[in-house]
């Protein structure tokens, strides 16, 4: 049986992923997205930058021939080379499975070498019995660093160091460091004195091997048992961890086919484990469960039990439900996203001699910016809108013009909310969203690695004249960020009392950041900030919807809205903008603006739907 450091890393993130990496059909893997490839390049670049002042040697061997790699590495260690980059360490009988030599090409990655092609010789361990007495461990630390001390080589030994793009010393990285140390000890016949991680911003970070080694052995043993017994783990969809995984499509299809509870917002792995002990394993059972019973368990604190049961009821009925006061989806939904943390979840992807390693734990960047922070009190939402007392009136549906630059279908919309009613909505009824003659819908596109917010998109909806106009303030380079900030502010003051609707709190945080960065006078930005209304916050506080996630795309698509570019999402826009800076291809900017406009329109659709929904449930 062949166990590599990359397989062990996959196992820590998802047992099923590790199982499929070894026993699955590689032909079913999803092709890598542009964003995944970008993250891989970023990780490789970071490693190169970290090593630019280092003097090192690297073993050379045919791609995928780990036995040759181990021999070349051992030769460098015997010579006493100070730094060895991407060495190969092997413990156990190499390449033996039931007495027959097994190729290792492709064994430790999901789908493709760094440059994108599929492995030439896929390995299917499921076709063989895997005796636990015949285990080969393969470790490939980023650096082997020479230290004083006795080993079989002489009066020197080696320690390991891994270079991660992450800002944090995650436990999974520390476990891999302990794995490296264990295999290294068998090679040099002495336990390394230390193991290190090099992290972005934190720099060098020492792993506590006394703490992590026992944990590593427990995880390693569980992984070996799973593969040895070919015990396929149960599917579980976790949007934070699954979105960039190459097995996502087949796993999601399996989950959908059985209506797995992990598809419900709020059903985390720990909560699902508790539900299984209560024999609640399907949507119908959860919909009929007692929230009072669930609330007795620590996995369901406060109102989470009631919310989860309601969520199941909404899915079972395939219709939205009114959320009771004091309850909020943001209190129990964990499939949230964060633009600033994407690179924290990049695995090591610089090994040019093997299939590219997968990226795990990445938050879903396709709908950017869901966070829990409360931005302001509910009462502030309605304080600036006056509703005239005239007859009820409905607006026509939005008609979008398809640009000639795309052949994709135009965005579609649901029925807009009425601007007026037979009686005005009292200010005290905070359950209602503002309905104003002119409304602004705002969305930002950003490049996190450059700390650049390069596009402010605003849809101006004039309900009195039944018109809509989109404004895209685009910075074609970082130098133009300040200029588009001023242009955006000028538009906000063109409509000095219009509410500004956005989805999630990224826009608010960025608005504050830019005001500070460009020394904007308080009188120009603080009154504008008070006009912001977070539609995500309103939806999650007021409604239970039959969606997999309370991100913008699942909600808007459930309402019938479609983005014109099926491929487009926030992560793809990061790639497009990065490519624009390199190539100057203006079609990339047009695609970004088109996507941003559709995000604004989707926010408009969700806001109008929610307004109508709340009006319908008015007491």
What are these regions (language model features)?
Residues 248-265, 269-278, 282-476, 481, ...:
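C-terminal extensions
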Residues 198-201, 207-258, 272, 283, ...:
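Acidic, Mg2+-coordinating catalytic module of metal-dependent nucleases/exonucleases
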Residues 65-68, 289-290, 379, 389-394, ...:
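Short linear loop/turn motifs
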Residues 1-153:
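Metal-dependent nuclease catalytic cores that hydrolyze phosphodiester bonds in DNA/RNA
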Residues 51, 181, 512, 604-611:
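Short, amphipathic alpha-helical segments that act as regulatory/interfacial helices
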Residues 84-95, 105, 111, 131-134, ...:
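Conserved DEDDh/DEDDy metal-dependent 3′-5′ exonuclease domain
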